[in-house]
């Protein structure tokens, strides 16, 4: 599930993870080992290809900052904390780990996240993002990215 903190983005818009940061991890210790980083970046070439694909598909998107954490950002206070700590455009739970492992193993990678709701949407009220409907769009995005590599 993704929670967006950028008010210019709306449900079904996409954030390409140019920079992805752990939200609730102390990076002082982790950053002492390869890849010696406190944040992680999607591969520049993959970002370029994905951006072209999304533009061609007329999907609103940005290449921005994504924060990955182990909790839902579901209140204005949590949104403010996340923005202050990370300047994130979106919040989710897996992207930093994916890019961290990829960077550690020298593998180019890309994090692509669709907005499912606003960061201040209560979890119980979360219903405007239809995952089954968006799965078709996600598959088309993935296939088009692969075709353009």
Give residue ranges: language-model regions:
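Mid-sequence, gly/pro-rich, charge-dense loop/helix-turn segments that line enzyme active sites
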Residues: 4-86
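His/Asp/Glu-rich mid-to-C-terminal helical/loop segments that flank catalytic regions of hydrolases
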Residues: 119-149
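Active-site loops and adjacent core secondary-structure elements that bind or stabilize anionic groups
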Residues: 1
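Short, hinge-like loop/turn segments at secondary-structure boundaries
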Residues: 13-16, 109, 128-130
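Short C-terminal domain-edge/linker segments immediately following a structured domain
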Residues: 26-32, 44-50, 95-98, 122, ...
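A C-terminal functional module that forms or caps the active site or interfaces directly
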Residues: 72-124
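Generic structural signal for well-ordered, non-membrane alpha-helical segments
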Residues: 39-47, 75, 91, 95, ...
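A structural motif corresponding to the C-terminal end of an alpha-helix
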Residues: 53-61, 101-107, 141-148
């Amino acid at each position: 599930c993704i929670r967006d903190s950028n008010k210019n983005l709306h449900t079904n818009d996409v954030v390409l993870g140019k920079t992805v940061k752990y939200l609730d991890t102390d990076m002082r210790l982790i950053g002492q080992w390869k890849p010696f980083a406190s944040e992680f970046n999607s591969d520049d070439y993959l970002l370029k290809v994905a951006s072209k694909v999304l533009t061609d598909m007329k999907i609103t998107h940005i290449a921005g900052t994504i924060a990955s954490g182990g909790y839902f950002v579901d209140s204005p206070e949590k949104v403010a904390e996340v923005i202050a700590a990370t300047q994130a455009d979106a919040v989710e739970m897996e992207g930093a780990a994916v890019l961290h492992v990829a960077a550690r193993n020298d593998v180019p990678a890309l994090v692509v996240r669709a907005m499912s709701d606003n960061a201040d949407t209560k979890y119980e009220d979360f219903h405007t993002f239809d995952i089954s409907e968006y799965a078709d769009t996600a598959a088309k995005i993935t296939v088009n990215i692969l075709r353009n590599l």
